[in-house]
């Protein structure tokens, strides 16, 4: 642990189109090398595709439902006890839940087979909002791992 004081959390401004802080966080995860305009075009393009594909729901609702479906409730953390390392299941804090969900969505989108990042992101968001896709599978695997190591839950922090 650092001996200095804890770093302050920086305030993020809401995105210009929807006025949503979570969309801005998502934009920052998509962004490479400080190119925010490129990340903005990718996300808004993906939202346009979502709007065309899902008439029953707006792109922002689809985005938030995708995030909710990917966010893990429980994860495992390594804990050393007497020479053995146990994978101890712990609940995930709300801010980490959102960060993991965003990270998994972006990673899964980058690995998809479509041509442009806009199409990849739209496809992954659509899949995640329908409870399928790589990001949702990652969440399921995390939950399975926690369930398998439930016997070590008494080693909590």
From Swiss-Prot:
One of its GO terms (molecular function) is structural constituent of ribosome. Keywords: Ribonucleoprotein, Ribosomal protein, RNA-binding, rRNA-binding, tRNA-binding. The keyword RNA-binding applies. It comes from the Bacteria. CDD domains: uS7_Bacteria (cd14869). GO terms for cellular component: small ribosomal subunit. One of the primary rRNA binding proteins, it binds directly to 16S rRNA where it nucleates assembly of the head domain of the 30S subunit. Is located at the subunit interface close to the decoding center, probably blocks exit of the E-site tRNA. Belongs to the universal ribosomal protein uS7 family. HAMAP family: Ribosomal_uS7_B. Part of the 30S ribosomal subunit. Contacts proteins S9 and S11. This is Small ribosomal subunit protein uS7. The lineage of its organism: Bacteria, Pseudomonadati, Pseudomonadota, Alphaproteobacteria, Caulobacterales.
């Amino acid at each position: 642990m650092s001996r200095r004081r804890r770093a302050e959390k920086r305030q993020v401004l809401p995105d210009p189109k929807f006025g949503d802080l979570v969309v801005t966080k998502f934009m920052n995860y998509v962004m490479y090398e400080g190119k925010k305009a490129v990340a903005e075009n990718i996300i808004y393009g993906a939202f346009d595709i979502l709007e065309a594909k899902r008439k029953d729901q707006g792109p922002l609702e689809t985005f938030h439902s995708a995030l909710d479906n990917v966010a893990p409730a429980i994860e495992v953390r390594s804990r050393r006890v007497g020479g053995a390392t146990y994978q101890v299941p712990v609940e995930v804090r709300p801010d980490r839940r959102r960060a993991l969900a965003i990270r998994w969505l972006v990673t899964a989108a980058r690995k998809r087979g479509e041509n442009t990042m806009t199409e990849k992101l739209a496809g992954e968001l659509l899949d995640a909002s329908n409870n399928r896709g790589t990001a949702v599978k990652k969440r399921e695997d995390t939950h399975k791992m926690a369930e398998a190591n439930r016997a070590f839950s008494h080693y909590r922090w």
